[in-house]
């Protein structure tokens, strides 16, 4: 239609492409990203809530074999009897505990009649210059511990382990990476000690049950994806209305003069 021909101008075509790209990103990237974070947070909150109301269970019921992992039982309290490997410890660096930097101290624990599992003993604060402070020794005798089951973390890309102050140091608690460093085969999940446990250090608390803003952000991106093409349509309609008003307000074109009018205009009218 001629009245819509202006939409084929470069400016309108560029605007339409921007709106289409923005809408596509809203529905396929931005909204799913926030909704996925909301689903993860809701799942973790549910696991924490369940763990607070459930008594500890033997570790071997959730990790029966050496290659076992239990992502559906994260934060669940478990008990295990066995021995630490005191000469094989690794530090997780650049951890934030109560708003301050900390090291988390990791050590393998051999469960009697069960798997060898990585144990997060807790945290210690770094000395000046991010150096490792003196770390209390582990017990060498058989002990029984109570801890929370945790999922192995993904390794940090581009951040390789290194040795400093006599300790292997890593940037995440990835059981596969720690197993490769120590040469000790570890289960897929690890343990985080609760308070007053043998070999424990600074206690790592349970996260607050906060759903976060992710659901509202996801809904907002969906709304933006809906409103963007509506806005484009509104501006196109407004342009059409403006052109109609401009056309209606312009004076009608002059009618062509007849031969008599031309002669009269040139020689004058007869009296």
Swiss-Prot record:
Keywords assigned: Cell membrane, Membrane, Transmembrane, Transmembrane helix
Compositionally biased tracts (Basic and acidic residues): 262-271
CDD domains reported for this sequence: SURF1
Transmembrane segments: 11-33, 172-194, 214-236
A Pfam family the protein falls into: SURF1
UniProt GO cellular component terms: peptidoglycan-based cell wall; plasma membrane
Region called Disordered, residue ranges: 245-271
InterPro entries reported in the protein's UniProt record: Surf1/Shy1, Surf1/Surf4
Subcellular location: Cell membrane
Topology term for the membrane: Multi-pass membrane protein
GO biological process terms, semicolon-separated: biological process involved in interaction with host
The UniProt record lists the keyword Membrane: yes
Family recorded in the similarity comment: Belongs to the SURF1 family.
PANTHER family cross-referenced by the UniProt entry: SURFEIT LOCUS PROTEIN, SURFEIT LOCUS PROTEIN 1
Protein name according to UniProt: Uncharacterized SURF1-like protein Rv2235
Protein species of origin: Mycobacterium tuberculosis (strain ATCC 25618 / H37Rv)
